[in-house]
């Protein structure tokens, strides 16, 4: 049993929920959950991230990703506040750690766990973002609202400040 078996179990549940709804992500997740090789897990984690970022790039930035480095697109999504900051951090972590799988660099097996955990966080956010039906529940996305978390917190804060100034 690998030290990342719990993370693979979580990703397998996600795989089951996206089956038939997002073929590119499904393909990469299927390969990821079937392997127990640490290098291959890192490679397929990055490939899952690439599928997600390429899709977001086409939807939000209205262009194809092309050959632009993944990190540059992550930075752009962060700068333009398209993706919530906590998801950006997870994307950066998966992107940087997954290079160990693609290149002959040394890494500790326990470093694979946080990559898979971050990928789980990213994909769960992405499922909500893409309005994919999960377990029979269709999640809606409001285009004007920053996706899934971003501006909700800010708008509530503004309401509290406005309400407190009105009561003075």
Q: Where does each model-flagged region fall?
A:
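Amphipathic alpha-helical interface elements
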Residues: 1-164, 168
């Amino acid at each position: 049993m690998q030290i990342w078996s719990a993370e693979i179990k979580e990703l397998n549940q996600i795989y089951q929920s996206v089956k038939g709804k997002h073929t590119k992500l499904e393909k990469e997740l299927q390969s990821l959950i079937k392997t127990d090789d640490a290098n291959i897990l890192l490679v397929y984690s990055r490939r899952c991230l690439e599928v997600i970022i390429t899709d977001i790039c086409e939807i939000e930035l209205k262009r194809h990703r092309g050959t632009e480095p993944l990190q540059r697109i992550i930075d752009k999504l962060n700068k333009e506040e398209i993706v919530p900051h906590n998801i950006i951090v997870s994307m950066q972590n998966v992107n940087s750690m997954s290079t160990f799988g693609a290149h002959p660099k040394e890494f500790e097996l326990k470093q694979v766990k946080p990559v898979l955990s971050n990928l789980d966080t990213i994909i769960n956010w992405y499922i909500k973002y893409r309005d994919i039906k999960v377990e029979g529940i269709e999640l809606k996305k409001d285009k004007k609202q920053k996706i899934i978390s971003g501006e909700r917190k800010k708008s509530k804060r503004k309401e509290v400040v406005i309400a407190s100034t009105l009561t003075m």
